[in-house]
Amino acid sequence: MSNKAVIILSGGMDSVTTLALAKDRGYDCYTLSFNYGQKSISELDAALYYSKKYHCIKHKVFDINFGDFTDSALTNSSTSVLDNSEASIPKTYVPMRNIIFLSIACSWAENINSTNIFIGANAIDYSGYPDCREEFLDSFEKMINLGSKTGSEGKIFNIHRPLVEMSKIRTKWIDTPGKNTKLIKPASINEVKNDD
């Protein structure tokens, strides 16, 4: 079994915590970030910073501009997060984002002979984003195992989601219990830019 894992790393608190947990579990981590036209582009600096801080094998940034075809508050400067009112799906929802991110992560994982993908979906995301739900992640895992060379060869992709049952508050204070790494608390973007 390969000890490699692809970590979807936005640079935010959840994905950095997920990276720390993967490292603590002994995985050789390959981090994957996405430049999808998001307003919080500075998180990509944080993703690179934490990839280096955790001694990841490789860090890649994949460019895809969701802003060309969606009006999510995360990608469209004219859409406000505050415009959400009573909507069940938040204005920050980017259509099919995790489907695309997970597909690309699985493609890279297959290329490096890995079956482990980590995503930092959590309980807060679960409440509003359809592609952060446990049911979605279970179904995606089944689908990717049916539609990949890896699955056809009898190996099983595992979509690890260690934070799916946690709130952001709990995630903020989680401490990795193992000996492989000490969780580095996510820093402010200014600290990231000023630290070598």
Stretches with model-predicted labels:
Residues M1-P177:
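ATP-dependent adenylation/nucleotidyltransferase module used to activate substrates
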Residues L183-D196:
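Cysteine-cluster motifs in flexible loop/terminal segments that predominantly coordinate metals
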